[in-house]
A protein has these predicted regions:
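A short helix-loop-beta-strand connector motif used in the catalytic cores of GNAT acetyltransferases and
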Residues: 53-71, 170-173
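Active-site acidic-Proline motif in GNAT/NAT acetyltransferases
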Residues: 86, 99-101, 105, 134-135
Length: 182
């Protein structure tokens, strides 16, 4: 059975609202945790169990000043999302999720390109920053193919804070990735 293309049906990009919280939590969870995440390639199921986020965390991003939760719909269904936060000369990219059934079809590439465009045009930023769990070599390689570079700057994983999941290993940390937006 052929994989769906990101361009099979038109995509709609919009800012998330309070009404989107439950759908966004379900999307983010399905993309990274549990058995459903294994349908895609971005699963963290082997390194983290439990939740990836919760309704309060998503609502916090929606409501935060200088922050947007870009929501992507296709045929009326939320299929992807990402956080954009204005931080002075750069924007922060996070909470990125693509429906596992649509991963590998170009949708993620489309979403990140649109997020970069919006950050550049809306805030006039010259860089996009993100943090990725450093052991996620496949995911880091995907970002590198999109122009992001590893900085070697690490921050600790929030061990003991189950809002971010239950670690299955003791060597987790976040690495800062940066891309010049031109």
């Amino acid at each position: 059975m052929p994989m769906e293309s990101a361009t099979d049906t038109a995509l709609t990009f919009r800012d998330a609202t309070d009404a989107d919280v439950d759908a966004l939590v379900a999307l983010i969870q399905s993309a990274y945790r549990g058995e459903s995440s294994r349908a895609g390639w971005t699963t963290e199921a082997d390194i983290l169990q439990g939740q990836r986020t919760d309704p309060e965390g998503v609502l916090e991003v929606i409501k935060a000043p200088d922050s947007r939760l870009l929501t992507v719909e296709r045929a009326g269904r939320v299929v992807a999302c990402c956080q954009l936060e204005h931080r002075g000369a750069h924007a922060y990219f996070g909470m990125f999720a693509v429906s596992p059934a649509l991963q590998g079809a170009g949708l993620g590439r489309t979403v990140i390109a649109e997020a970069e465009r919006q950050a550049r045009e809306t805030w006039g930023v010259s860089e996009m920053h993100m943090t990725v769990i450093s052991v996620r070599e496949d995911l880091i390689a995907w970002y590198e193919r999109r122009g992001y570079r590893r900085t070697g700057r690490m921050t600790p994983f929030p061990y003991g804070d189950e809002r971010f999941g239950i670690p299955q290993r003791d060597d987790l940390e976040f690495e800062l990735l940066v891309k010049e937006l031109v």
